[in-house]
Amino acid sequence: MEIRRRPPNPTVRVENLEYAVPHREAQAKNILEEIVWHKDIEIKNFKKIVSLEDLIKKIENLPDPKDFYKNILESKIKPGLIAEIKKASPSKGVIRKDFNPEDIAICYEELGASCISVLTDKRFFQGSYEILETVRKSTNLPLLCKDFIISAYQIYKARVSGADAILLIAAILSDDDLIYLKKIADNLKMSVLVEVHNDNELERILKLKSFNLIGINNRDLKTFKTDLKTSIELMHIYADIFLKQNILPISESGINCAQDLESLRSIGIKGVLIGETFMRESDIEKSFKKLFNSI
């Protein structure tokens, strides 16, 4: 686990006054840490509106989640596509001004996407759980709640909002947290896509022996720079292990052209998560065909 949790400001007493004093360790070291620290505040605010107990009650009447793994494995297009709905990002700002989640979801399904990823982080990506709910009403495809999950509360909220799967990021979670949150998802019959960015994180995940969907993020979440070599280098080392353990490797981010897609398919990548490439184009169908029709 590379990302710290927000340290509390120490309390200082002066006679009858107590106040918190900010210190150097209370400053986030990078974008990812800043996002994670803000999640603590966001979750507290969510709980003021809807309690965990109320979320659990709402889940009782929901149908079982859709099978994320199966949809990627049986995809007609190869590699299987997790198409992402994302309005903005910390590095690019607003990516898609003409943002209609319902229309985008319908388009993705018609084009043959296996699953859809929906950004739910509000402050940094201009996403929301309301967008996830809208997309759920617009498509029959399995939905991934794309967020920075650090609490069981977020998993229950994702399920109530229509998610079939969640993302867990190895860089922000300890091994104990990963196992605990995976058990929560398993109990709700939700799929889990666990995300790694380097061999150290991947080794951690493989040792846990709990995940059959592993996302290799080509974007360094500390700097938000992308490099497709991340997937290529890790696949050269771990492709045989993935195959033997029935793990579906998913390459995420930085996939911009048909050549990128073919390079990933040829080394054993079974699924790709693509968002910005579609979101920045006014004609999503045209962008899709540039990627998939030539491989």
From Swiss-Prot:
Pathway: Amino-acid biosynthesis; L-tryptophan biosynthesis; L-tryptophan from chorismate: step 4/5. GO terms for molecular function: indole-3-glycerol-phosphate synthase activity; phosphoribosylanthranilate isomerase activity. GO terms for biological process: L-tryptophan biosynthetic process. It catalyses: 1-(2-carboxyphenylamino)-1-deoxy-D-ribulose 5-phosphate + H(+) = (1S,2R)-1-C-(indol-3-yl)glycerol 3-phosphate + CO2 + H2O. CDD domains: IGPS (cd00331). It holds the Pfam family IGPS. It is an enzyme of class 4 (lyase). Its EC number is 4.1.1.48. This is Indole-3-glycerol phosphate synthase. It comes from Prochlorococcus marinus (strain MIT 9312).
